[in-house]
From Swiss-Prot:
Organism encoding this protein: Ralstonia nicotianae (strain ATCC BAA-1114 / GMI1000) (Ralstonia solanacearum)
Principal place of residence: cytoplasm
Protein name, per record: Holo-[acyl-carrier-protein] synthase
Chain's gene name: acpS
UniProt binding sites for Mg(2+): D11, E65
This protein's UniProt keywords: Cytoplasm, Fatty acid biosynthesis, Fatty acid metabolism, Lipid biosynthesis, Lipid metabolism, Magnesium, Metal-binding, Transferase
Record flagged with keyword Transcription: no
GO molecular function annotation: holo-[acyl-carrier-protein] synthase activity; magnesium ion binding
BP terms from Gene Ontology: fatty acid biosynthetic process
Entry similarity comment: Belongs to the P-Pant transferase superfamily. AcpS family.
Gene3D superfamilies in the cross-refs: 4'-phosphopantetheinyl transferase domain
Listed NCBIfam families: acpS (TIGR00516), pantethn_trn (TIGR00556)
Catalytic activity: apo-[ACP] + CoA = holo-[ACP] + adenosine 3',5'-bisphosphate + H(+)
EC number(s) reported in the record: 2.7.8.7
Cofactor(s), names only, from the UniProt record: Mg(2+)
Length: 138
């Protein structure tokens, strides 16, 4: 399924910093950074607990940064905040979904990205591995 490592990326962010940005932007930061599926999940978590909402937002921000590093683009076109979403399978495993021109860019290079995200009281962390998909068919 996967082959050689194309790149790795990691990011850590202080959740309090995300809280400050949300206050300064009156909540618009979440709309700028999160994709549509992530935004729905964020809003549901925030409705249950402000802290859970902030932790979710922080992990997704860190995931986008980690992915941008793993694919070697940083935050430059076609890598945009909303073009990458980190969602969860029913098992809880986080998975990366791409859209738009970034999806084409990823497909052209034959990449697959693995992601891990976690948060603790003060910090959110993400680690991404971009792999070249094997050309061999099963």
């Amino acid at each position: 399924m996967s082959g050689a490592i194309y790149g790795i990326g990691t990011d850590i962010i202080q959740i309090e910093r995300v809280e400050g940005v949300m206050q300064r932007t009156h909540g618009r930061f979440a709309e700028k950074v999160l994709g549509p599926d992530e935004l729905r999940i964020y809003q549901a978590r925030k409705a249950r607990s402000e802290r859970r909402g902030l932790a979710f937002l922080a992990t997704r921000f860190a995931a986008k940064e980690a992915v941008s590093k793993a694919i070697g683009l940083g935050m430059h076109w076609p890598m945009t905040w909303r073009a990458v979403q980190t969602l969860n399978l029913p098992s809880g495993q986080p998975v990366v979904r791409y859209s738009g021109e970034l999806a084409d860019w990823i497909a052209q290079r034959g990449l697959h990205i693995q992601i891990s995200v976690t948060d603790e009281r003060d910090y959110a962390v993400a680690f991404a591995v971009a792999e070249l998909q094997s050309k061999l068919s099963a």
